[in-house]
């Protein structure tokens, strides 16, 4: 018997944020996420030391899922961001950068964690209240009767992901397809509570991006030989569909729970086949036109159905079961017994289609709330990133449908918000502190650390040595290229602000980001004509941004409040 190793005592560390190891690892994580941020963010290649799949990305969801972290504090931070991204899809890097900078900034102040956390909560509440208010100067309404703002929102997501490797023309094409795919999921006669359909992304790797398209209904990939064997159906009415979630292969090992009793001298295989053929006879008598099976259909049953001009398709997989149920109105059949008439559904029509080298069986719905986005890209790496980006964009559109507002992007919301907080804390600190135990000096220190963290997110957009400025009227971001001459006439160097709403021809005064300047009131209440005339805005999802802001501050507060880290080393 081998000797058992004695248990090691748990490792207990006090004041974890004061250790050099923790500060270094936080700094490394911050540099990784910061370098990925924005349209010119740098790509990361992630792979393990034993080879295998290599992930090339700049997206937080792919980055953090492939990034192995071991320190408990980093695990808290990455888990918080991953939970946010799993719920909202967008603003993961924003959340990570803001959280890391908040932790770094307040550590330098020497204030007690209790004071820092209390004031951070006040500032977070101030931010959320302002961003949700009617007077907010960086929030615009989204009109679903017009595609202009919706296209801007989708385009902003695509352009922020450089690993997709899209040209401007390709970006416009894919943006329009994503928007069309989303609009197809909205029921035409929706009243009250809306139940959205689903957009399925079908891979077409190695094809031109411009060949991507959207089709109503579901595409089932098949070989050319299989398609040739399918009999054409000519019918003026809808086609009746039966959908099976159990195997029709006759395999007795897949009978589900329970006991199979077989009489002596009876062939089990023949008994099961007879039952399958009886099932086929019921399908024929019920005038079914199309049989779909998640698993395998026995060749004899398939031939029997084909003889009676019923199309039978098997091995469709679990992924398509939910969309097929929604689109056809079927109830998946899970047994070989008698079929309830309510289990059947229908489709408007079926046809075959070919895209690139792939062949598909196309199910055309009665009502187009399920659609297929055939997504093309040059190679596997670019396609994987584009697929993830399209899923993000579709989710953002769903969130925007629930809360039809968008925030100005390109860093303008962050600089505007920082200007608003500075003005509020300098000119009306009593409204923030109220009956709190904190002093105005502590509020000024924390507010500056908070605003500096917001501006650090903005600074992360610049990766090529350029300068970032803010104007003293709107509080928006303006970028200057690294090789620009140092002149006082900024309008000659600046064209548009980060979000694209304002141009430099207005009478504006600028200052460098993070430079010392007097607090000012950023203009609120966006003029309707300014928003309506802008056709190429950079926008962010309001719901995702608010959640990211909240997660960043709350996670930073949680980490700052840690007094001990206890690790079980066994």
Swiss-Prot record:
One of its GO terms (cellular component) is motile cilium. Changing residue 492 to N: In BBS6; uncertain significance. It holds the Pfam family Cpn60_TCP1. Gene3D superfamilies: GroEL (3.50.7.10), GroEL-like equatorial domain (1.10.560.10), TCP-1-like chaperonin intermediate domain (3.30.260.10). Changing residue 325 to P: Has a modifier effect on BBS; causes a mislocalization of the protein; fails to associate with centrosome. The keyword DNA damage does not apply. InterPro entries: Cpn60/GroEL/TCP-1, GroEL-like_apical_dom_sf, GROEL-like_equatorial_sf, MKKS, TCP-1-like_intermed_sf. The keyword Nucleus applies. Changing residue 286 to A: In BBS6; fails to associate with centrosome. GO terms for biological process: artery smooth muscle contraction; brain morphogenesis; cartilage development; cerebral cortex development; chaperone-mediated protein complex assembly; cilium assembly; convergent extension involved in gastrulation; detection of mechanical stimulus involved in sensory perception of sound. ATP binds at residues 192-199. Widely expressed in adult and fetal tissues. Its main location: cytoplasm. Residues 198-370 are annotated as: Substrate-binding apical domain. Changing residue 395 to R: In BBS6; atypical mild phenotype consisting of retinitis pigmentosa and polydactyly without other signs of Bardet-Biedl syndrome; results in decreased interaction with BBS12. Keywords: ATP-binding, Bardet-Biedl syndrome, Chaperone, Ciliopathy, Cytoplasm, Cytoskeleton, Disease variant, Intellectual disability, Nucleotide-binding, Nucleus, Obesity, Sensory transduction, Vision. It is found in: Cytoplasm, Cytoskeleton, Microtubule organizing center, Centrosome; Cytoplasm, Cytosol; Nucleus. One of its GO terms (molecular function) is ATP binding. The substrate-binding apical domain region is sufficient for centrosomal association. It is linked to McKusick-Kaufman syndrome: Autosomal recessive developmental disorder. It is characterized by hydrometrocolpos, postaxial polydactyly and congenital heart defects. Bardet-Biedl syndrome 6: A syndrome characterized by usually severe pigmentary retinopathy, early-onset obesity, polydactyly, hypogenitalism, renal malformation and intellectual disability. Secondary features include diabetes mellitus, hypertension and congenital heart disease. Bardet-Biedl syndrome inheritance is autosomal recessive, but three mutated alleles (two at one locus, and a third at a second locus) may be required for clinical manifestation of some forms of the disease. Probable molecular chaperone that assists the folding of proteins upon ATP hydrolysis. Plays a role in the assembly of BBSome, a complex involved in ciliogenesis regulating transports vesicles to the cilia. May play a role in protein processing in limb, cardiac and reproductive system development. May play a role in cytokinesis. Belongs to the TCP-1 chaperonin family. Component of a complex composed at least of MKKS, BBS10, BBS12, TCP1, CCT2, CCT3, CCT4, CCT5 and CCT8. Interacts with STUB1. Interacts with BBS2 (via coiled coil domain). Interacts with CCDC28B. Interacts with BBS12. Interacts with SMARCC1, a component of the SWI/SNF complexes; the interaction takes place predominantly in the cytoplasm and may modulate SMARCC1 location. Interacts with DLEC1. This is Molecular chaperone MKKS. It comes from Homo sapiens.
